[in-house]
Amino acid sequence: MSISMKDVDPAFRGVGQKDGLEVWRIENFKPVPVPTSSHGKFYMGDSYIILKTTALKNGSFRHDLHYWLGKDTSQDEAGTAAILTVELDAALGGRAVQYREVQGGETEKLLSYFRPCIMPQPGGVASGFNHVEVNQQDHVTRLYVCQGKHVVHVKEVPFVRSSLNHEDIFILDTANKIFQFNGSNSCIQERAKALEVVQYIKDTFHEGKCEVAAVEDGKLMADTEAGEFWGLFGGFAPLPKKTSSEDNGDDKETVTKLLCFNQGTLEHISFESLEHELLETNKCYLLDCGAEMYVWMGRGTSLQVRKGASEAAEKLLIDENRKGSNVIKVIEGFETIMFKSKFNKWPPTPDLKLSSEDGRGKVAALLRSQGLDVKGLMKAAPEEEEPQPYIDCTGHLQVWRVNGDGKTLLSSSDQSKLYTGDCYIFQYTYTGDDKEECLIGTWFGKKSVEEDRTSAISLASKMFQAAKFQAAQARLYEGKEPIQFFVIFQSLQVFKGGLSSGYKNFIAVNGTDDDTYVEGGLALFRIQGSGSENMQAIQVDAVSSSLNSSYCYILHNGNTVFTWTGNLTTSLDNDLVERQLDVIKPDLPSRSQKEGRETDQFWELLGGKCKYSNKKIGKENESDPHLFSCILSKENLKVKEIHHFTQDDLMAEDIFVLDCRTDLFVWVGQEVDAKLRSQAMDIGEKFLLHDFLMENLSQDTPIFIVTEGSEPQFFTRFFTWDSAKSLMHGSSYQRKLAIVKGGATPSLDKPKRRTPAFSGRNAGQDKSQQRTRSMSHSPERHRIRGRSPAFTAIASAFENPSTRYLSTPPPAVKKLFPRSGGSELPKTSSKQSAINALTSAFEGPTKSTIPKSVKASPEAEKAIQEEGSTIGESENEPEDDENSTIYPYERLTTTSDDPAPDIDVTKREVYLSSVEFTEKFGMTRASFKNLPKWKQNRLKSDLQLF
């Protein structure tokens, strides 16, 4: 569908070109922009259009359109909003999803734009109402009902006792105090979310100066705050229980109807099974599902037909007295997941979203059609950047090979050599922002047997439980490894075959040839990676069809070693080949083969020449993340998407799944029961199986289990993260209540990049013993391919001491976690300094600063962790106020029934007397202050003071 900009209202021209919200109010049947400062402020007598523009990772924009109808808006104004929304969608390219929003029945997506809630005010423009500014009049006591676990629907109800019930949460806003009444049948998550509304009311209508009280349904007059609350209603009286008719009021089964909009009328379409083939591209359809109605617009329809279908949907709702129903309008090719799920089977839809690359092609095609020379305009798109690992790559790695019911710890020289027929368990510890972090994972080779996989899962789970769930857990399959895995191993070799008894038995039973790698045999390796800290040698079939012009290869047979360089490779690829030669064949010279100039011997080893690919093996790109709350009931997984999520959406009582297509994260709250916690990996696997977003997710997609309080940065990067929030004690409701009542809000600073406090893989070791994990040969044998020992010694004096001692200098790769190795030569050193450095290289063995992967003693590691955690701490921490008001310990805990008033909830310990402080913490205040911050928080958490 093409439209002229003359058909578009001037208020809509040039919109939707940047990430964010744009809002219009309908005034005299025209859209009038609402200033940003008034976004979220709605009047009951008005209609609004809301455009949410989201910048996607592929460079394009996604547009979501909503038209909001106040309960007192006129029918004509509502119809205008509906038609203008269709017009705005056409101006944006005809891809937006359009939502009809009715006051009191808003979608969770709309409410997520205006957190914590929408509280419409009386008044309106078109209706002749006067806008009422609440802050300008005397305070009126109001009662609100709050519903929702993830976003809150707020509705004002009459200030009478009969408005209260056991199922919901109510907020009573009085002149001097705000009460939150928690119905006995309401859940913790709803109570926590309602507290966000309490905070909003406190800040908006009381300028932040107001007391807050929480009243539990069932507490009588003996409770002071409960007594005060019930006194405002004229005294306590039992609330009636919900009747059975109320319970069953929404259980009516609705019949799905399909109607075709044809020449201004609606025609019923009969069907036995709702199939995609019923929809024709040159027509519009209404899919009536009862609570919501969908309008499907074929791509071949005109703007006028789409406007007519939109008007027909509005009229149908009015005629059937269903003004509160939601209407979702979708365009062919851009249907929502919920719409597709209504059909028996929906065919795969090609990705129609335009990226910046598509746009460049369209511009070039236009210029070419006008006779212009576009040579040079259509440059190849810049190569996509390697994803950041968001993990410190200088930690300590241990690897076990699984063999039956047991596991064998591999030596440091063998831990980066994996076999495709085996399963492995790895444990990686590294320094985080404020504590040591740990990742425990399993790696399943493509040809590993089920027996070993089951054993690996069991053994890794026991290690995870032994760590008291304070580590992250990963389940990885060969060929689908995330970037974190590669930078942890740095130099990785994956060989054919396997060494486990399970694999050997499997090939014996099936009569399969054992192709396990033999050092002196025939083998071909594809070399890949992005640098010295992320490189792999993957053994492939030793045939010429395994070659690819975009890669370099190593081929060996006995003492014969070839390197093969594809025509599309880079200097970095050549560097990686040299580095991998130092690992695979360190003692033998190699013969270089350029593509197109190979020797006959090279082709003979590969069984003759044949066709091969020149396209780089594709990698899936990370998609925009989606967060889902998960409920596992009788082996059935139910999920609900959380739109425009924040850290505050992660409730301590729940399990959430974060899906970014290339990786899947399962987040487990601290308050989740042990049985459900142990099923976290099952939840991740079920999520992949159901493929809720219809992404064609692979069952081999990496799954990470993340526990609250131990979130790694490669998870927290999806949020604006405040680590203090995840370390607080108690339920999500108790935590938010402490903040709302105490008036102290945790810091909302963005997460800091983790920088290792020490250089190297294991900072506690003596530097003279350190060596790189990517070298399999002796550290004493400092060998660089093609250089004499003397030249090597001279060159080493000029090289960065933290550089790996491999064949060629590493490329200048930007590192997220740069090593902080030994002192470097000044950038402009004198000639004498250079001579002195050269001389010292010959006077004794070079003292390597390259890290070693042998684990230090527990005592040394503990000292390192504590010392490392204090580095970078502010030296200007405020002193404890010795003259602070003193409270007993019982009144300072987060679970106290009689909490101390007007305290800083982030420093509860400073209100303890010196005697009680020493008794509870087992140390003096001075000793406590000298502890690293993470250890202070852990002790406070254990004592329920955090």
Curated annotation (Swiss-Prot):
Q: Which SMART domains match?
A: GEL, VHP
- Source organism, top-level taxon: Eukaryota
MF terms in GO: actin filament binding
Here the segments flagged for biased composition (Acidic residues) are 874-883
Where is it mostly found? Answer: cytoplasm
* InterPro entries listed in its UniProt record: ADF-H/Gelsolin-like_dom_sf, Gelsolin-like_dom, Gelsolin-like_dom_sf, Villin/Gelsolin, Villin_headpiece, Villin_headpiece_dom_sf
Q: Name one Pfam family in it.
A: Gelsolin
Q: What does this protein do?
A: Ca(2+)-regulated actin-binding protein. Binds actin microfilaments (MFs). Involved in actin filament bundling, severing and capping. Caps the barbed end of actin filaments and is able to sever them in a calcium-dependent manner.
**Family membership:** Belongs to the villin/gelsolin family.
- Repeat region (Gelsolin-like), residues: 28-109, 152-219, 274-339, 641-715
Q: Where is the protein situated, by its record's location annotation?
A: Cytoplasm, Cytoskeleton
Q: Which organism is it from?
A: Oryza sativa subsp. japonica (Rice)
Which gene is this protein's source? VLN4
Q: Which Gene3D superfamilies match?
A: Severin, Villin headpiece domain
* A GO CC annotation given for this chain: cytoplasm
Compositional bias, Polar residues, is annotated for: 765-777
Q: Which UniProt keywords apply?
A: Actin capping, Actin-binding, Calcium, Cytoplasm, Cytoskeleton, Repeat
- Write out the ranges of the annotated region (Disordered): 744-789, 801-832, 844-902
Q: Which residues form the HP domain?
A: 881-946
* Protein name (record): Villin-4
| GO BP terms in the entry | actin filament capping; actin filament organization; actin filament severing
